[in-house]
């Protein structure tokens, strides 16, 4: 963990996986801006400098709290296209990439404006969207240094992206893979951002930019129409919560997997988790087994507008206690479970007045669908691939429906006031990483920097491994590997601080309002205090 990735004892802070993005947010905080304003500045730069994980062709999920501890969630999730069913064959999986996966609209830009409206109304925010995205426009137009992460994901997908002509034109200039630190320009994306700055966020959905987007998407066979874009709106909803020791954990509700994170922590709570030590085989085993119980119930989560199911019942105390009792301290549960893909970015900010925002922004898979919408420079997400084509599945495709969502930024309150902001990249890995981080922070008293630097794992299939193994970073130690194997875990050692283990960030607020925080050493990011 480098000094550049950590920050200590400040009144305000921003964290993200990109140093340039964090610097944009920190400038807003120095100028007296709110946490939401700082996050919008940070998020817009990430849409330029971290295009492999997020962009304005994707979605965003927010958790916000004022300094009194009033927590809300903003679901910036695009809905299924009205004519999307015309491209689906029942029983045949939706394509993971390409036009067939572009079945949902994109809500990131609307979420920025929605959050800014909240900031202006409730937090005294004065900054507008146009000024906040100006740094992003400048970087897209004038160029920025390509990150190691972007180069890694270009190289990792080089065989796939060779089949994405419009994508290749944008991201492999002159037909070659760029190298780390090379200056990269996104002129078409700059023009799209300029339109948003000039005409407002709704130009993306109802104006000239919407026309360009639909023209580009329809040219490759996407069913998304301008009418679909016009219906896309961010929703303010109540967060779900769980008491854990002396804090209350908050997460976004269905259709996100925020409930999976809370279920995991609820099972750990019922197990009396403080009886085991940090970093031991017991620690890893019990967290893994709690995650398995949560994931076995997670697949019923879907858009609450399309079901009468009360998903908060998943947090029933008796059920969590029963799951905890079912866990053997010496034997691992077999694990055949489908993997959900996804890559995203976590960013968060706390301002000098105590207001907080914890956000995940994503195009679903790394590089989304691989489809660039015409000459807009916008990579469209492939979130439509999260739907099922089985009409009896809770997450079956339906026009206007929100897909099951892996994004679940978190927040913890202590004494009724914001105490932790946290989140991670990693699809199925999100609840897993968060459970390890939260136990390290809350049960074992580690600092944000130390909690992030410690070894982590990823359970089940991944984009690079079709086996249902437990991938554990090698620095967990030989004794831990041996003990876990003896309990029946099928293990695969992965490198220290592996990309498979996600990129997380944490901001911690003490009772006097001072903050410390860090971004993951597995990322290119930085926490900046003000």
What name fits each language-model region?
Residues 236, 341-344, 405-407:
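Short, small/polar residue-rich loop motifs at catalytic or cofactor-binding pockets
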């Amino acid at each position: 963990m480098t000094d550049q990735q950590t920050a200590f004892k400040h009144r305000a802070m921003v964290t993200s996986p990109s140093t340039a993005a964090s610097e944009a947010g920190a400038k807003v905080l120095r100028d007296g801006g709110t946490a939401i304003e700082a996050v919008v500045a940070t998020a817009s730069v990430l849409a330029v400098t971290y295009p492999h994980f997020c962009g304005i062709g994707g979605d965003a999920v927010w958790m916000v709290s004022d300094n009194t501890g009033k927590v809300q969630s903003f679901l910036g999730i695009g809905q299924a296209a009205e004519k999307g069913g015309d491209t689906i064959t029942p029983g045949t999986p939706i394509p993971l990439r390409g036009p067939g996966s572009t079945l949902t609209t994109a809500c990131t830009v609307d979420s920025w404006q929605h959050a800014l409206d909240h900031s202006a109304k409730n937090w005294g925010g004065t900054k507008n969207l146009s000024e906040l995205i100006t740094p992003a426009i400048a970087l897209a137009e004038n160029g920025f240094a390509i990150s190691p992460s972007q180069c890694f994901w270009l190289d990792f997908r080089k065989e796939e992206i060779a089949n994405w002509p419009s994508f290749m034109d944008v991201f492999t200039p002159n037909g070659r893979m760029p190298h780390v630190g090379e200056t990269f320009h996104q002129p078409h994306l700059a023009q799209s951002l300029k339109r948003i700055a000039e005409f407002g966020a709704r130009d993306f959905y109802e104006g000239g930019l919407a026309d360009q987007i639909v023209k580009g998407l329809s040219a490759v066979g996407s069913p998304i129409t301008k009418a679909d874009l016009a219906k896309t709106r961010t929703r303010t909803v109540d967060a779900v919560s769980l008491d854990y020791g002396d804090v209350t954990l908050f997460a976004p509700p269905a259709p996100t997997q925020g409930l999976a994170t809370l279920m995991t922590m609820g099972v750990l709570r019922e197990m009396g988790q403080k009886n085991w030590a940090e970093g031991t085989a017991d620690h890893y085993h019990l967290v893994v087994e709690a995650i398995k119980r949560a994931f076995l119930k997670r697949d019923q989560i879907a858009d609450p507008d399309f079901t009468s199911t009360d998903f908060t019942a998943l947090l029933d105390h008796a059920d969590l206690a029963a799951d905890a009792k079912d866990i053997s301290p010496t034997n691992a549960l077999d694990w055949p479970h489908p993997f959900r893909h996804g890559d995203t970015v976590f960013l968060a900010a706390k301002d000098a007045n105590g207001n907080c925002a914890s956000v995940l922004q994503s195009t679903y898979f790394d590089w989304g669908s691989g489809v660039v919408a015409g000459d807009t420079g916008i990579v469209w997400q492939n979130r439509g691939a999260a739907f099922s084509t089985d009409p009896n599945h809770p997450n079956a495709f339906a026009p206007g429906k929100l897909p099951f969502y892996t994004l679940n930024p978190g927040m913890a309150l202590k004494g009724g006031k914001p105490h932790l902001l946290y989140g991670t990249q990693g699809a199925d890995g999100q609840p897993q990483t968060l459970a390890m981080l939260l136990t390290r922070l809350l049960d074992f008293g580690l600092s944000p920097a130390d909690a992030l630097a410690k070894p982590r794992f990823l359970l089940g299939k991944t984009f690079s491994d079709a086996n249902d193994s437990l991938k554990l970073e090698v620095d967990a130690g030989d004794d831990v590997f041996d003990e876990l194997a003896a309990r029946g875990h099928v293990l695969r050692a992965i490198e220290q601080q592996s990309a498979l283990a996600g990129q997380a960030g944490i901001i911690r607020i003490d009772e006097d309002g001072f903050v410390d925080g860090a971004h993951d050493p597995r990322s290119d990011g930085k926490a900046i205090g003000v």
